[in-house]
């Protein structure tokens, strides 16, 4: 599973050092549910600089909202998650 997690992150995520934010394209969320769940949890943990991952129930809800386009901007695990067109931008909460 770790191989698929890393491949999903490598192929579908761009890190901007100047803004310290991640840009996630739409293909990221078209992977199997477990791969999306684990890799998105890992990204939030990295950007939010947390030791523990976020709660699964909250993460499931956010992934569903992203897939159905019912999201504008929200926070989870010290990160701001916003959807712009077909991409999701993940940045650290100040």
Segments predicted by a language model, with ranges:
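AMP-forming adenylation/ATP pyrophosphatase catalytic core
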Residues: 1-94
């Amino acid at each position: 599973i770790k191989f698929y997690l890393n491949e999903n992150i490598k192929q579908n995520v761009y890190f901007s050092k100047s803004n310290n934010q991640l840009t996630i394209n739409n293909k990221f969320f078209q992977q199997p549910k477990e791969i999306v769940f684990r890799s998105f949890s890992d990204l939030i943990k990295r950007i939010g600089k947390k030791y523990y991952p976020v709660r699964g129930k909250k993460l499931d809800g956010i992934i569903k909202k992203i897939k159905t386009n019912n999201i504008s901007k929200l926070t989870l695990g010290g990160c701001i998650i916003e959807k712009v067109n077909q991409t999701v931008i993940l940045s650290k909460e100040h």
